[in-house]
Amino acid sequence: MDRLVIGGRELKNRLFIGSGKFADERVIRDIVAQTGVEVVTVALRRVSLSGDGENILHCIPKECVLLPNTSGARTAEEAIRIARLARAAGCGNWVKIEVISDNKYLLPDNNETIKATGVLAEEGFVVLPYMHPDLYAAKELERAGAAAVMPLGAPIGTNRGLKTKEIVRILIEECSVPVIVDAGIGKPSEAAEAMEMGAAACLVNTAIATAGDPLVMARAFSQAVAAGRLAYLAQPGERTEYARASSPLTGFLGS
């Protein structure tokens, strides 16, 4: 049986979505209803801690798993503080660690991410760290208690696709926790490719939120992720350098 279990929770849909950049955040409810998406990320700064004013949580169905991220954190200490605030605000104990001090490419700081992961895992958080693809860092995150690792496919928000494919492939082969491809995926075909490689899930935000029709794009991504997973489970045939006939080339008309 093909199961994805993270933090004791079994997930049936392997597409995770972000909640940022939508022109109308109310479409998130429709996306969840039509695709069955179960995990939605949210930046804590978009959650009303006082209960007053606009609150992104009003647009996310209660049956979803909230995955607060530590967007804005530049150090492990800041990420830890944001995660604790999110849990205190009622966002649950799942957290996506983002520690970014690079303002140009927004690449994650793996060293600070490892530090934050260790502390928060000890405190009972289900930690999903966003990371720059690197096998040694992924192994350190595992040892620190990460429930999954989330390597980037390309820099955040670029829609450039799976540029880190070969390193992500190594992580999938060598990591004992789920590998969730996060950031940079721009088209459903790219999500399908990640899943065909054996990724456990894909997290997509910009490609859906900035599409001409976000709801239709979300449906396309959900189907692509499911198809890619099925293809992986089906064990695709090997690639060969030369052509191989699918029917005999001799004997039909005699020798």
Curated annotation (Swiss-Prot):
Residues that bind 1-deoxy-D-xylulose 5-phosphate? G157, A183, G184, N205, T206
- Keyword Transferase among record annotations: yes
**What EC number(s) does the entry state?**
2.8.1.10
Q: Which UniProt keywords apply?
A: Cytoplasm, Schiff base, Thiamine biosynthesis, Transferase
Q: Which GO terms describe its biological process?
A: thiamine diphosphate biosynthetic process
Q: Which Pfam families match?
A: ThiG (PF05690)
Q: Name one GO cellular component term.
A: cytoplasm
**Listed pathway(s):** Cofactor biosynthesis; thiamine diphosphate biosynthesis
Q: Quote the subcellular location field of this record.
A: Cytoplasm
Q: Name one GO molecular function term.
A: thiazole synthase activity
| Role noted for this protein | Catalyzes the rearrangement of 1-deoxy-D-xylulose 5-phosphate (DXP) to produce the thiazole phosphate moiety of thiamine. Sulfur is provided by the thiocarboxylate moiety of the carrier protein ThiS. In vitro, sulfur can be provided by H(2)S.
* Family the entry assigns: Belongs to the ThiG family.
Name under which the protein is recorded: Thiazole synthase
Organism for this UniProt entry = Heliobacterium modesticaldum (strain ATCC 51547 / Ice1)
Q: Which gene encodes it?
A: thiG
